[in-house]
Amino acid sequence: MRKSAIAVVMAAGLIAGVAPAEAATAPTRPTAAQKLQLQYLVEEEKLARDVYAYLAANVTSQKFSNITKSEQTHMDNISALLKKYNFFNPTLTRAPGVFRDAELQKLYNDLIAQGSVNLAAAMQVGVAIEELDIADLKKIMVTPAPADVKLAYDLLLKGSYNHLAAFSR
């Protein structure tokens, strides 16, 4: 009986996309550090969305409009995790281009100025944002996380690579 229970647990972990060793060590709730990371990530996704929305309105490229929608989806996914775990969402009452994190606020202002020069500069801003997202995600993905948080990280990373490719063409 005990062996079959272990087999069921291992199978459930494999179905969920988690290796048996990971299933045993993955936390069921985000740590305090992961809470802060999720709050930062939702603001970082907001930065991307807000910059791309501004550039879509001021630079002639459909890429910015399309990727703005994708960034909103990323924000929605992280926002859902924040809500699920009853964590504060720093983006809920913020207007476009307004951030709680002072470094992100400065970065937004700088990127808008850089991207407003011409289409080539705007595309470089897109590359810079996606490279930043990828670097930040890779840093935080080394720590075990709950399955839903890990899945969100994986989807954000995949999306960032897709956006990077679009801006690099």
Residue ranges, per PLM feature:
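Sec/Tat signal peptide C-region and signal peptidase I cleavage site
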Residues: 18-25
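Bacterial N-terminal signal peptides that target proteins for export
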Residues: 1-7
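Bacterial N-terminal signal peptides
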Residues: 8-16
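All-alpha RGS (Regulator of G-protein Signaling) helical domain and cognate RGS-like helical scaffolds
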Residues: 25-169
